[in-house]
Curated annotation (Swiss-Prot):
Origin species: Saccharomyces cerevisiae (strain ATCC 204508 / S288c)
Other remarks in the entry: Present with 1670 molecules/cell in log phase SD medium.
Resulting phenotype, S174A: No effect on thiol transferase activity
Name of the protein in question: Glutathione S-transferase omega-like 2
Residues bound to glutathione: R15, W79, R155, V158, E173, S174
GO CC, one annotated term: cytoplasm
Molecular function via GO: glutathione dehydrogenase (ascorbate) activity; glutathione transferase activity
Active site residues per record: C46 (nucleophile)
Length: 370
């Protein structure tokens, strides 16, 4: 996309506020919990949508809430699905992929990206570039927005949590969608282990909310404010802020590792990694929200968004250990991370930043072994 991202004349990027902010609960007058009623529309490239896929998997909701994946290439009309008119829709793959952790996209199962030279922006590889939209045959995410609200006039973003019964958008704010998925709303449809999974435990909620607040502004959104800056002074301010807060995360994780090493001994790495998280000694929403930025940092943000003081692997040993622990030891993280979609989306969609559309092959590997 070649249009400007800055708001006004100061050259600073401003993120759009989400428009659909409902929830799902037994008490809600419209949106009641039900198996098969709700659907997620996501991009595997998008860090905000990635949050929802990880949460959906960790909570055991893949069989409860289906998922469709848009094409990695974002053009002037927005996110799009594959045209499936010529596909065999009764194939076994077609029937099963909706409830896969990554919507059936095959490259999400791979831990290393490949050559991109022969891949065109209009590539139509089923369950590689995208899936179709199975309910209405829509070609664009925008079609869902207009179906929900014919007067909608803002940008067409993902993720979208959709209600098939009322044919409306429940919510398009990722931070709220993951809270909906983590709530007890769908407990009757999952097993006991997943019922016990709580990504925002009451005793840690205040700490999680505080951590999320500064991570969002300075890291999650900070890389975008850096990469989309249209004045040098804005860029320099934002990139310094990103790395100041990565330093803060590194200190938190360094201190955490030291305490765990003292508790378990340096040799018991399995026990150390079992409690090596950002807030508390268990996996929480704070880890999910930070992960989706950190996993994209070396492959994309270092070069594409000019966040190039250092890389995670070279400059932040404890963040590097933390992100590899999540990727290699938790399927919900690993199998929703698609390095092909991530690299192709940013380098092919942001023509103002990368006008030739050449996708860098490095770093190699996309993620190092644990």
């Amino acid at each position: 996309m070649s249009k400007q991202w800055a708001s006004g004349t100061n050259g600073a990027f401003k993120r759009q506020v989400s428009s659909f902010r409902e929830t799902i609960s037994k008490q809600h007058p419209i949106y009641k919990p039900a198996k098969g009623r709700y659907w997620l529309y996501v991009s595997l490239a998008c860090p905000w949508a990635h949050r929802t896929l990880i949460t959906r998997a960790l909570k055991g909701l893949t069989s409860v809430i289906g998922c469709s994946v848009v094409h990695w290439h974002l053009d002037e009309k927005g996110w799009r699905f594959l045209d499936m008119e010529k596909q065999l829709e009764d194939s076994e793959d077609f029937l099963e992929h909706w409830h896969d952790v990554a919507g059936g996209i095959r490259t999400a199962k791979e831990d290393s990206s490949k050559s991109f030279a022969e891949i065109k922006n209009d590539s139509q590889r089923f369950m590689v570039d995208a899936t179709n939209e199975p309910h209405y045959g829509y070609k664009r995410i925008s079609d869902l927005y207009y179906k929900s609200d014919p007067q909608y006039s803002a940008r067409f973003t993902v993720p979208v949590l959709w209600d098939l019964e009322t044919q409306t958008i429940v919510n398009n704010e990722s931070s709220e969608i993951i809270r909906i998925l983590n709530s007890s709303a769908f407990d009757e449809f999952v097993d006991d282990d997943h019922k016990k999974t709580d990504l925002v435990p009451a005793q840690l909620k205040t700490q999680i909310d505080d951590f999320n607040s500064w991570v969002y502004d300075s890291i999650n959104n900070g890389v975008y404010k850096t990469g989309f800056a249209e004045k040098a002074e804005v860029y320099e301010s934002e990139v310094n802020n990103v790395f100041e807060h990565l330093d803060k995360v590194e200190k938190i994780l360094s201190d955490k590792y030291s305490k765990l090493k003292a508790k378990y001994g340096e040799e018991d790495r399995q026990k150390i990694l079992g409690e090596f998280f950002t807030v508390g000694d268990q996996l929480t929403e704070a880890d999910i929200r930070l992960y989706t930025t950190v996993i994209r940092f070396d492959p994309v943000y270092v070069q594409h968004f000019k966040c190039n003081f250092t890389s995670i692997r070279a400059g932040y040993p404890f963040i590097h250990l933390w992100v590899r622990n999540l990727y290699w030891n938790y399927d919900a993280f690993r199998y929703t991370t698609d390095f092909d979609h991530i690299k192709l989306h940013y380098t092919r969609s942001h023509t103002r930043i990368n006008p030739l559309g050449i996708t860098p092959l490095g770093p190699k590997p996309d993620i190092r072994p644990l």
